[in-house]
Amino acid sequence: YYICESCWTCESCAGSTESSCVSACNACDLCPNK
């Protein structure tokens, strides 16, 4: 889950365990704050 923080900073998803956020974190390019 913490891959989020190393990919981008996103207030709504960073550190989140919600499946939609986890998927975004794994993709690294679905967050506009990339």
Curated annotation (Swiss-Prot):
Molecular function (Gene Ontology), one example: ion channel regulator activity
Organism in which the protein naturally occurs: Iotyrris olangoensis (Sea snail)
Tissue expression remark: Expressed by the venom duct.
Domain notes for this protein: The cysteine framework is XXII (C-C-C-C-C-C-C-C).
Function as written in the Swiss-Prot or TrEMBL entry: Acts as a neurotoxin by inhibiting an ion channel.
Keywords: Disulfide bond, Ion channel impairing toxin, Neurotoxin, Secreted, Toxin
Keyword Secreted: yes
Lineage: Eukaryota, Metazoa, Spiralia, Lophotrochozoa, Mollusca
Key word Disulfide bond present: yes
GO cellular component: extracellular region
Disulfide pattern: none
Compartments it resides in: Secreted
Modification comment: Contains 4 disulfide bonds.
Name of this protein: Turripeptide OL127
